[in-house]
């Protein structure tokens, strides 16, 4: 792919690692049985959901298929009599919901083909073993020296990747394993670059990479052949498992698990970090490190499945690191996955959840230090260390590796540029998915907080306080409105409230009624003996209010008095003497 050339348009492929959630919404009783309506959702978007209808017998069939795991799953028991009662159906519906919750909480079970077909039959109805056989048969037409011995059924966790035990016709005792895989959602290479890089893998030589004997690819899949190893993978060593057994049987509920000795942890860890650094320096994206992808050859670990990133397949731990926005490059993904691997080597089992709040006692504090730098809350929040930084930590810095094999992996400049662009596209999709999950988590937390009992109580208290405050404000506004009305009514002619005949005490709300009444006014002066002709009689004095209400109103009127509201008056002076 040329510089700055956009990846070719392609159809959107399903990411099998995106978690499915299922909710039993309702039930409907027919003549002889009951059907349960289940809402299934892929990922965080409610728009990406659908309904399925399942009977109890379908659940029972799924449960029988999962017995290979050895897990005791909480499927509600069968009932022959009274199984159509309303109360029984409601109780069974709750039990079936709990059954689905337990399965989907298990990382291995949630990714298995049995559950995917049960919940999403439209996308998982194909028989990938038959598809793989067809592709392999077409390949054998041009390469007749290979022969299929038997299919290795379900030895891996991927739904769209199948394995076959092979042999060469002229070397019947030598056993090989063929892996066939479909394209994944992160395939951003052009078809030409993709096929060239797949065919380049047999030329990769490194003491800690498991050799590829043969590799070829079509526009839609890839096929690789490697030597079959009877000892199996690092995960087989930890879980005491047989390599040919199904993945669910080997790793879902192992009877015996054992962590490795400290020296093994140091040696294997150093070897794996060295090969990761080699790939990072070459610009080759990996992102698929886990214990089942590390082959054991004597006392040496060798990395498997370099083709996965070229095919665009999602990582085994993708549902973990999509929760943390700082794990947003393939290098940081490799370091985080190394933390999972180191935990499994140390304790003989994967962590119950990630991030890990506290680590159990280990054979060395140096082990815990590396685990804390890759799996702790702080590490997941702030970001992963580099591979070079891990190599400098005390757990690995003093490990001496002795090997005579010189690493070789020549990638042409054009293909290296294509890998760089594809890597950026993979990281961009990862970043976008992490952003969506982060926004969804914030929205969910806000909705949960808004609907919590504590938040409802707080809103009730605030509403009560607001109601009391409004009532107080309304009660304070009433006297003001009353005084304004009185003021506007007496602002024209003379009014007893504006009479200056008696002073009024300072107004204080609530105190006017408590003050003693004023002393009675002095008696009016005696009237004149007789009015002179043409003079007007003075108006008789008005009675003065003696109750507290009128006193308060009087004070309010005086305080609110505005000179501009008075009407202009025309004065007629009759004091001048009249001359007859």
From Swiss-Prot:
Q: Does the keyword DNA damage apply?
A: no
Alphabetical UniProt keywords? Actin-binding, Cell membrane, Cytoplasm, Membrane
**Can you give the residue ranges of the WH2 domain?**
549-568
Keyword Mitochondrion present in the record's keywords: the answer is no
Give the GO molecular function terms: actin binding; ATP binding; phosphatidylinositol binding; protein kinase activity
Q: Which GO terms describe its biological process?
A: inflammatory response; modulation of chemical synaptic transmission
Ranges where the Protein kinase domain occurs: 88-481
Against CDD domains, the record matches this protein to: PX_MONaKA, WH2_DdVASP-like
In this chain, composition skew of type Pro residues spans: 515-531
Localization: Cytoplasm; Cell membrane
Q: How does it sit in the membrane?
A: Peripheral membrane protein
State the Pfam families in the record: PX, WH2
Region entry Disordered, spans: 433-551
In what residue span(s) does the PX domain sit? 14-126
Compositional bias annotation for Low complexity: 483-514
Say which family it is in: Belongs to the protein kinase superfamily.
Q: What is known of its domains?
A: The protein kinase domain is predicted to be catalytically inactive.
Name of this protein: PX domain-containing protein kinase-like protein
Q: Which organism is it from?
A: Rattus norvegicus (Rat)
Query: Encoded by which gene?
Result: Pxk
